[in-house]
Amino acid sequence: MAPVFDPYRLASVSLDVLAAGRAGPGALAARQRARLARLRETIVRASRFYREHLAGIGPEVPLAELPPVTRQALMARFDDWVTDPQLRLADLKAFTADPDAIGQAYLGRYVVWESSGTSHQPGVFVQDAATMAVYDALEALRRSAPLSTQRWSDPLYLSERLAFVGVLGGHFASHVSIERLRQLNPWMRRSFRSFSILQPVAELVEALNSYAPTVIATYPTVAVLLADEARRGALRFRPRELWTGGETLGSAVRRRI
């Protein structure tokens, strides 16, 4: 089954992202208000949970004054929370229990992520093609500094060896995103490998040294670990690019890396 991807929507969103990047504070604030109004209208109409949760609260009430919700409350009423009645928590749990389905489209049109449950409540998150287009556009246009000479000559990373270092084996956002990327770009299936952070550090270092990636994607905490290994001479390669996500990258951590 093909991964969730709409090239026309991606093109449209990319143009919108570029336009927003040139907008002033007033225009951005107006855009935010309009989008929030559409979002509230949609969830009140299509989500039973939010229709009850926001009952009696008019659209003029500011976002900061809306009653908050918790992940526990949302997951407890998942089937009422979603806006598509075809989405059912029991079915989604069966889908995320299948490791062979990582990165595959659910019902032919959704990307599904799960959280590890570090807050004692695992979450299930469903993304449609419109959402993925926004993620893809932001990743492509705002993730990094302006393109270097290397990237202009190789925008598809054909000459690179890419490595994702993270938690594997589940439908976690980063792992699903990497698998989806591989499916969308077949040339990356051999040049983009994944390495589990749950293995002993010595084994991870040995595996990375054997592969010698030129680009590493990982979490800031893992990037610090790898930087420390490089500092003591254990890593025998020097990547040209390091991508981080999933956690906040503070200035002190950035300097250390």
Segment roles from a protein language model:
Residues 1-114, 120-160, 210-217, 236-237, ...:
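Nucleotide 5′-phosphate-binding alpha/beta core
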